[in-house]
C-alpha cells in the first residue's frame, strides 16, 4: 500500500509502477503484470458517506422493526405480573409478544431438552457451523495481502490443512440434518392428524416464510449499509462488489434460484446453500409421499434406492465426461475450481445424495423413536471403526491430488466425485443413530452436552452473518502481514465471537419472531379447519426446537389424546404406542404375530422417569384372557390390525379409593371385553375379559 497525491489517477499510478518494476521483467527474474483499478484508489472524497434512496428505505425498515421490538418487549414485561390470569396460549398475546426480546431471549437461553429429543443434533449443528466459519476465515486470510503467499501452494504438506482444503464437505452435514428433520416431522404429522393429507404447498409456504425474513434483511444490509461501515484499498473489491451484486441480483436470492441464475455475481456467496436446500425441499415430495402414504415402506425404500443410485451416478458422469477434478483443488488448478463449483458444487442434482440419506434416517429414527435397539458389541465397535475410517478417508483422501507428481486419473476423480459425499454423511448418520440408541459413548455425550443448545439455536443466523466480518477483514487491510497458523486461529476466534454476537441480535430481531408468527398462524389455521391432531410425538429436535437442519421450527401440540392405526389385518405386524397424559409417546414397538407378548417389555424405554404415566389407557385389541399362570396363548392376538388408544379419564371411579396407595397394586374389574389394560409404572400389558381383575399401580 502506498500513499500518493490525491491528484494522481489510477492510470498514472499504474504507469509509474510499470516503469519502476520494469527492470525485474527485463532481467527475467519476475514475470508479473501490473494492474491498478479505480476501485483500489481511495481518497477522503471517495470515502465520504453518501446515502441514496435504497439506504434510506432500509433504514426506515430497521426503524419500524426497532419500534415493534420496543413495543412488544414493553408489553411483555408489563404483562408479567398478570401471567396467572393471562392465557399464554392466547393467539393475540402470542402475536403481541412475538417480537419481545424478553420472551425470545429466555427461549434462546433455555437449556432444557425434551426427553425424546436427539441431543446430539445440537452439538453437530453448532460444530458444523464452526467448521464452516474456520474454513472461510482461513480462505479469507490466504486471499489477503500477505508477505509469504508463496507458501500457499505447499499447504497440503500439513495434514491438518485438509480440514480447510476439503472443508466444504461440512455443508453435507446440514443437508443430512435437513432431510432427517423433514422426514421426522412429516412422519409425526402423518400419525398426529386423524384426517391427514399430504400438503406439499403448505410445506413450501412454511419453509419460505420460515427462512426468508432474516435472509431478506441480511441481503438488504449487504446492498445498503454494509458499505458505509468502512473503507480501504480492497474495500470496493470485497464489500463494494457484494453491494453491487446484491442490488442487481437480490431477486434471485429471494426466489432461491441464485445457484443457477447469475452465479458469478451471486449476492452473498455462501447463499448457494440456501438455494440448494430450498430446491431439495421442492423435490422432497418425490420421496416424502411414498414414505407417508405407504406405511409398509417397501415402495419408499425402492424409490430411495433409485434416488441414491442417481445421486452417485450424476456427479460421476459429469466429472468423467467433462474431465473435472474429483473436488475443488483450490490453488492447484484455479480454472478447474471454477468449473467444479459451477457444474457440480452448487447444483442440486449433484448435492441431493446426503439429503435423501437424511430422509431415510429420519424415517428409521421415527420408526424406532422409542425402542430399545439391541446391537451386538462387536457390531457396534465395527460400525464405529468403519464410520471413522470412511469419514477420515473422505476428508484426507484428496491430499494426494494436490502433489505435483500426481497424474490426473479420470476414473479416480469420477469415483471420488460420485461417492465421497454419501460416504461422509453415512459416517455422520452412524454417529446420530448410535447416539440416539445408547451406543454413542463419549462422542454421543459430548455432542449432547446441554451447553450446545443455545448456541445451536443461532446456527442459521450465524450462517447469514459470518461473512460480514470476513469481508470486512479483507477490505480493511492496509498493510501486509504474515500467513501463520496462530494468526489464523486468532482471526478465527475473533470472527466466531463477533458472529455469534451479531447472530444473537439477528435471531432475536428477525428469526425467532417470524418463527413464532408462522407457528401460531399454522396452529390457528388447523383449528379453524377442524383438524384433529394426535399428541405431540416428541420433538426429535426438542432441545433446539429445530425443524430444518440449521433452521428452527416448533411443532404444534394438542390436548386431544386418541389414535387409530389402520394397518392391513393380513399383515404380520402392528404398531402399539402408549401415551402419557401429556401426550408423549412412552414407547413404541412392532409386535409380530410369532412373538411372545411378554417381549413387549424389551421395546420399552429403560429410563424409569420416561415410564411414568398419570392416566390409564386401554387398547382395544386383545382376544384371549389371561389365566392365573400367564398368557393363554404364546401369540399376539391376530386382530391387531386395528388398535384404538383411548384415554379413560373416569377410570378412577372404578377403583376402590379407600385402598388406594401410591406404591401398592390394586385390583378392579372392567366391563370391556377384548382389551389390554396398561398398568402405570409397570411395563406390562394385561389382556382382560369380563370378570377378570386387572392389576393397576396408581402414580
Model-derived features with residue positions:
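Hydrophobic alpha-helical transmembrane segments of integral membrane proteins
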Residues: 122, 165, 171-172, 176, ...
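Generic alpha-helical transmembrane segments of integral inner-membrane proteins
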Residues: 67-70, 74, 130, 216, ...
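Aromatic-enriched alpha-helical transmembrane segments of multi-pass intramembrane proteins
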Residues: 248-275, 282-425, 487, 497
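Exoplasmic/lumenal regions adjacent to the first transmembrane segment
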Residues: 1-123, 128, 135-171, 175, ...
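Kinked, hydrophobic transmembrane alpha-helices enriched for aromatic residues
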Residues: 116-154, 161-183, 210-229, 255-258, ...
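Helix-loop boundary elements of multi-pass alpha-helical membrane proteins
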Residues: 71-126, 184-213, 280-308, 360-389, ...
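Alpha-helical transmembrane segments of multi-pass integral membrane proteins
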Residues: 347-361, 381-512, 531-536, 543
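Intrinsically disordered, low-complexity regions enriched in proline, serine, glycine
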Residues: 11-14, 142-143, 184-186, 214-220, ...
